[in-house]
């Protein structure tokens, strides 16, 4: 092992073939014995947060990374051997093909480790992979050497050798473009002809009689089933390309025993699949172009609306080519599609029908989107929402998911005493002391899914810790000043804090008229709030608009969430955490109104439940589709 390793100035490793349940903590436990680690990141899907099956581990020293690569490659984590290689951030080096070789006709028992052990004798290997599907090895793989010389040595020595009693082919890796160019050149000089659609009464002799007139045939074969019956297709291999070409030109489309036969160049399975895929994509693109701007998506349909009623409602706006209500088990799914003959008619229908009440429900009408467009739009909305919600704060917002990377702190983090308490204990936790959290980082592996964390003591830091007043949530000028000017030294005195607060402008917040309160005068002592409308939740102190305005922005949502959670839990105990997180995206003034108005709160909760149920139904449908292999529209 060479600690200097001039080829790898970075100490970053790629870890692939991970089990879906592997986390950053597991990888840290696995790789930390090799040396100090800077960070670990398991790559996840942006929306579902499911693992993509690979991760990056960044060491402080290249020598430690190389030690991990040499000693831990193909080690088993959660029942799966992991594949480790250097993280190559320059895609041109990965795609250049220099030092990369291709091996085929591998025995099914040969895995990544066996292939690595076999070829490591020829030089330093950057990556090694046997291509697999759900049934195991597909019989071929790739080995990427550090140098082209090592790759050439491996080709010279291993091509044609026996591996597990099978003769393997080892050659230079060729890109798809190179392979397609070679296939195209070979296709022009074909000698093998494919014939189909000639019925069950055809045999080898009769097929040779039909095609022998075009030239010398090396072989003729009619494919048969287990009972010896013709399967309706076969092959004729000619000695010369000219004879094969003439047979295709003359015989394709001719009647043979009353059937029009197909005669063409014989293709390999991969080539045929590629051609069919290209044709399918072209048809799909043509269909998208044809229906662009004329196909409408209609939802919130009454259960009694069928295809005829849907067509009747939209007929006044133009010529309809199709109208369909989507059904399941004979019942309407509540949405459908209407296709017009021109974009102008479709636009008019959207303008007139969107929001119109048909039967008992207001319709939602919009241009239909493809699944890919819809997912891209939802992803964009999600990212914008996350960008607007997240604020720079050393303490993680308890209603947001934890960070996706695992960072190693320079000092051991203080033990986090914050936990997920049942709602009944929230009131007991409120009078607990609160400390400045500057510089502290909460433990990255708290289970935050589907739960909200009540206010709890935060990890101490190196600044002077000082509990606030025992009067809950009534903030003095001293508290406001300290909140807005957190530093790593001792806190300013009461007089200094009061002077500072007099200079700084307190942010103004707008609330609905029903919950607006007169501004309190700030002084240096905690005081009891004046008489004003307050939200009362059993077991918690009243919440007023002025109390909310006095709190730092990052704490306002937490204060509202702690009061919303028990109310929502009384309606939907199992979904309370998720619904609370969804409602907290609403403006604070509306949340205060919902706390005062049970009817408004119940309405919003019902909407959130409907969204969750629709999302769960969609996920279940996608699982069924992926299990059955039936493509969705």
UniProtKB/Swiss-Prot annotation:
The keyword Protein biosynthesis applies. Keywords: Cytoplasm, mRNA processing, Protein biosynthesis, Repeat, RNA-binding, Translation regulation. PROSITE patterns: PABC (PS51309), RRM (PS50102). One of its GO terms (cellular component) is ribonucleoprotein complex. GO terms for biological process: mRNA processing; mRNA stabilization; negative regulation of nuclear-transcribed mRNA poly(A) tail shortening; positive regulation of nuclear-transcribed mRNA catabolic process, deadenylation-dependent decay; positive regulation of nuclear-transcribed mRNA poly(A) tail shortening; regulation of translation; regulatory ncRNA-mediated gene silencing; translation. It is found in: Cytoplasm. Its main location: cytoplasm. Residues 11-89, 99-175, 191-268, 294-370 form the RRM domain. Residues 540-617 form the PABC domain. One of its GO terms (molecular function) is eukaryotic initiation factor 4G binding. It comes from the Eukaryota. Residues 452-473 are annotated as: Disordered. Residues 461-471 have a biased composition (Polar residues). The C-terminus self-associates, interacts with dazl and interacts with the C-terminus of epabp independently of RNA. RRM 1 and RRM 2 interact with both eif4g1 and paip1, and the C-terminus also interacts with paip1. Interaction with eif4g1 is necessary for translation of mRNAs required for oocyte maturation. Interacts with the translation termination factor sup35/erf3. Binds the poly(A) tail of mRNA. Prevents mRNA deadenylation and confers poly(A) stability. Stimulates the translation of mRNAs to which it is bound, acting, at least in part, with dazl. RRM4, together with the C- and N-terminal regions, is sufficient for RNA-binding. RRM 1 has no RNA-binding activity itself, but improves discrimination between poly(A) and poly(U) in combination with the other repeats. Belongs to the polyadenylate-binding protein type-1 family. This is Polyadenylate-binding protein 1-B. It comes from Xenopus laevis. The gene is pabpc1-b.
């Amino acid at each position: 092992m060479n600690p200097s390793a001039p080829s790898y100035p970075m100490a970053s490793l790629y870890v692939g073939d991970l089990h879906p349940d592997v986390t950053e903590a597991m990888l840290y436990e696995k790789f930390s014995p090799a040396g100090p680690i800077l960070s670990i990141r398991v790559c996840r899907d942006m929306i579902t947060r499911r693992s993509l099956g690979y991760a990056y581990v960044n060491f402080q020293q290249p020598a430690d990374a190389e030690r991990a690569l040499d000693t831990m490659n193909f080690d088993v984590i959660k029942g799966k051997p992991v594949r480790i290689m250097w993280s190559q951030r320059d895609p041109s080096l990965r795609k250049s093909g220099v030092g990369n070789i291709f091996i085929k006709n591998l025995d099914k028992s040969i895995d990544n480790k066996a292939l690595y052990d076999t070829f490591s004798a020829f030089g330093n290997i950057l990556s090694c992979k046997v291509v697999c599907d759900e049934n195991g090895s597909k019989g071929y793989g790739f080995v990427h050497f550090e140098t082209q010389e090592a790759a050439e040595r491996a080709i010279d020595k291993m091509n044609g050798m026996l591996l597990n009693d099978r003769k393997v082919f080892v050659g230079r890796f060729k890109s798809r473009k190179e392979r397609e160019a070679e296939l195209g050149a070979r296709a022009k000089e074909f000698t093998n002809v494919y014939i189909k659609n000639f019925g069950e009464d055809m045999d080898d002799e009769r097929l040779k009689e039909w095609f022998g007139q075009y030239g010398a045939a090396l072989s003729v074969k009619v494919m048969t089933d287990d009972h010896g019956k013709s399967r309706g297709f076969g092959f004729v291999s000619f000695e010369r390309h000219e004879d094969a070409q003439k047979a295709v030109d003359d015989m394709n489309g001719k009647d043979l025993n009353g059937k029009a036969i197909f005669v063409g160049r014989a293709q390999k399975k991969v080539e045929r699949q590629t051609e069919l895929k290209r044709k399918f994509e072209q048809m799909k693109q043509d269909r998208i172009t044809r229906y662009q701007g004329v196909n409408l998506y209609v939802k919130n349909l009454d259960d009694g609306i069928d295809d005829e009623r849907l067509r009747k409602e939209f007929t006044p706006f133009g010529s309809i080519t199709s109208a369909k209500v989507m059904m399941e088990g004979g019942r309407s799914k509540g949405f459908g599609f209407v296709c017009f003959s021109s974009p102008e008619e479709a636009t008019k229908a959207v303008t007139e029908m969107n929001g119109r009440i048909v039967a008992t429900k207001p319709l939602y009408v919009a241009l239909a989107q493809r699944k890919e467009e819809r997912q891209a739009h939802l992803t964009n909305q999600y990212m914008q929402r996350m960008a607007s919600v997240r604020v720079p704060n050393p303490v993680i917002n308890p209603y947001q998911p934890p960070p996706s990377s695992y960072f190693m702190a320079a000092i051991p983090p203080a033990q986090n005493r914050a936990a997920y308490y049942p709602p009944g204990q929230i009131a007991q936790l409120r009078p607990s002391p609160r400390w400045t959290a500057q510089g502290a980082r909460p433990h990255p592996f708290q289970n935050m899914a589907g739960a909200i964390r009540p206010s709890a003591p935060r990890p101490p830091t190196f600044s002077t810790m000082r509990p606030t007043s025992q009067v809950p949530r009534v903030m003095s000028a001293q508290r406001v000043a300290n909140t807005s000017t957190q530093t790593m030294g001792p806190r300013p005195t009461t007089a200094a804090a009061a002077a500072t607060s007099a200079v700084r402008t307190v942010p103004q917040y707008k609330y609905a008229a029903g919950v607006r309160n007169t501004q309190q005068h700030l002084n240096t002592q905690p005081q009891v709030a004046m008489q004003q409308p307050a939200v009362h939740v059993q077991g918690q102190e009243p919440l007023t608009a002025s109390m909310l305005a006095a709190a730092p922005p990052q704490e306002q949502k937490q204060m509202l969430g702690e009061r919303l959670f028990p109310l929502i839990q009384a309606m939907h105990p199992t979904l309370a955490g998720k619904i609370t997180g969804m409602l907290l995206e609403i403006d604070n003034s509306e949340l205060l109104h919902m706390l005062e108005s049970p009817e408004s709160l119940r309405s919003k909760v019902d909407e959130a439940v409907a969204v969750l149920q629709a999302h769960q139904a969609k996920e279940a449908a996608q699982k069924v589709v992926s299990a059955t292999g039936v493509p969705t529209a």
